[in-house]
Amino acid sequence: MKYVLVSGGVISGIGKGVIASSTGLLLKTLGLKVTSIKIDPYMNIDAGTMSPLEHGEVFVLNDGGEVDLDLGNYERYLNVTLTHDNNITTGKVYSNVIQKERRGDYLGKTVQIVPHVTNEIQDWVERVARIPVDQSGEEPDVCIVELGGTVGDIESAAFVEAMRQFQFRVGHENFVSIHVSLVPVINGEQKTKPTQQAIRDLRSLGITPDLIACRCKQPLEKSVIDKISLFCHVGPEQVLAVHDVSSTYHVPQLLEDKLLEYLKIRFALDKISVSRELALAGENMWSSWKHLTQGYDHLFKKVTIVLVGKYTHLQDSYISVIKALEHSAMRCGRKLDLQWVEASHLEASTNTSDPLSYHKAWHLVCSANGILVPGGFGSRGVEGMIAAAKWARENNTPYLGICLGMQVAVIEFARSVCGIEGAFSEEFDKECENNVVVYMPEIDKDKLGGTMRLGLRPTFFQPNSEWSKLRKLHKMVDEVLERHRHRYEINPAFVSRLEQGGISFIGKDERGERMEIIEKRDHPYFVGVQYHPEYLSKPLKPSPPIFGLVAASAGLLDEFIQSGEEVEWSNFSHFNAESALADMNDSVEVTEEATVVTIS
């Protein structure tokens, strides 16, 4: 087993997750089996009870694990299925150590950070690294370990010490350290001092980086690479320049030459036995990835989607939704133009308190090609979401509601079409007589952590739903598996009345009691799903519900359905520079003075 540690210095949020994912992707192109572990040095057991504004999106795994958003990156890049154990937190480690102490596993020893906590961390990494994560069902060859936060923070001290010891446990020949640092530009000059200091800090803790990934605005100058090489005691070939690019999908190509060449030699990868089947799959994956990124740069026609959410101040709160929209836009041959609307700005009260924000928000909603309302918790902004759903329904604007987004669409329909006065959700008004959304009876109302309906669960399309556009995108299957994260459901007592009003519950759970999918028949695309389709979307395999929204917004959905094509990429024949240039030529406006290219 080979291990790659990815750590960060200077500042957090520097792109360690993308670099870790890109490293894994490059190794997979060689036919190797790769897994990933994310270490989060916070005391929380998991990310389940954390606000998205505090830590970004809570990503949900097949087994119901509520984990850091970086595990979403790993799954998207590496096409693997991880478990909650692939996310290590201080809370989990300490909980395990305390349980062992209570059982007497330490035989009366004084329990300390070293060796007991550090050993627990190392044992965890070694155990999880051997769990199969792909379709081969075989033990991985390489494990990428990302250490969250910034080296030097007090929270990560035990994990850094554990990794220092771990490099000797597994052997130098099986362990590579990549340190990600920032190279800022001051007065037009790339500065290396922050990187030098970060490397000194890491060395003082016992870890010597093998590769230094330098995040920078522009490509690193040769003199800067030489300076980092000199003062950080690495060869110039061990300094990786990771400059800003148009899309994170380009990062693997930035790293390909230096990183892959170094790992091949250091890990003696040519000695690892790789089946012809996996080697060919790796080659095909890399070819597809390059075609995808090449085509992305030549997209000119836009599709405008407005996201009406509660946590728009931190876009990482919706990172999987953003990526899923990008995947679908690329599949449609469109450049995604994503506009953000704070849901509360659509509410009538905002017209009084902040009319500028109110009118700006409504202008974005009214001019969008499509509307997406994602999941969320709490009452803030809910009336704004309901207003957005009403606009989409009445004006034939393509709409997708995810989790809460489906619930607000049902509330709006109940009020406006079915005449259910005061229809609302038990989440926001427990005393309301007409709550069309209610608490699920099996859910613990007192304990928040890990008590929702979580993980991969089946949804069954109902009889007589053959007309459904969403079902057609799923190739008319009877059942789909999607990841869930919710406490509330559509009130079964109102289902019949809602269906009489004209909304169809085309998907239900295995018992036929829980409403999973809504769709409006006489609409270009009006769909709500109780699950979170964004969690399973991949660059080469977009999510059908989200693809449906983007395709309908681009005016391509009916044509796509009639063509019988798969949502998953089968080839890239229509996604290349030539077709993109044709699109661009279609949008060239000729005037007497000049030819103006309008990106529209």
Curated annotation (Swiss-Prot):
GO biological process: 'de novo' CTP biosynthetic process; 'de novo' pyrimidine nucleobase biosynthetic process; CTP biosynthetic process; pyrimidine nucleobase biosynthetic process
Pfam families the UniProt entry points to: CTP_synth_N, GATase
GO cellular component, one term: cytoplasm
Molecular function terms from GO: ATP binding; CTP synthase activity; identical protein binding
InterPro entries: Class_I_gatase-like (IPR029062), CTP_synthase (IPR004468), CTP_synthase_N (IPR017456), GATASE (IPR017926), GATase1_CTP_Synthase (IPR033828), P-loop_NTPase (IPR027417)
Every Glutamine amidotransferase type-1 domain range: 304-570
Leading EC class: ligase
Domain of life: Eukaryota
UniProt-annotated catalytic positions: 403 (for gatase activity), 532 (for gatase activity), 534 (for gatase activity)
UniProt family annotation: Belongs to the CTP synthase family.
UniProt function note: Catalyzes the ATP-dependent amination of UTP to CTP with either L-glutamine or ammonia as the source of nitrogen.
UniProt protein name: CTP synthase
Gene assigned in the entry: ura7
